[in-house]
Amino acid sequence: QKRGLIYKYFKIALSNLSSKKNFYITKRRDSSSLKKTIDNSSIYLQDVYIDKSISINVEELSKFKDLIMKMPEPRALKIDVQGGEFDLLKGSEGILKKFKYIFIEISFFNIYLETGSCENIFKILCNEGFKEIFSYNKLIRRDKLISKDYLFEKDI
């Protein structure tokens, strides 16, 4: 517990299927992902290129339902998975309704391969009963909106 927040760390990645996958570690460590970077990613983000890869266990968020249900309400979920947001949400349908708030980074210009569109991310959240209430932290490079963080609230 830190600053009144309760959290746990797990050495796994979240996506839409339970499996074992490559996790691509980029030179800029906070940009590492289950997704490979596009060839010219460094044009937009200088140190976002693959340095090495490791094999990692991948699970669906729903696998943590019991742990989620033990969390005090209102529950909040922070999603920042470097291009894997759509896949994570696809593997979370049904469990998302247990959260009141979702903080999510959404990319508009993909620097990762095989990502879902921002429109589909918004569609899943809308279908799960969430509405956008705030956006912040725009990342702009070379006059392109790369990503932005959003806060969604469960529409009761």
PLM feature spans:
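Phosphate/nucleotide-binding beta-alpha loop and adjacent structural elements of enzyme active sites
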Residues: 1-156
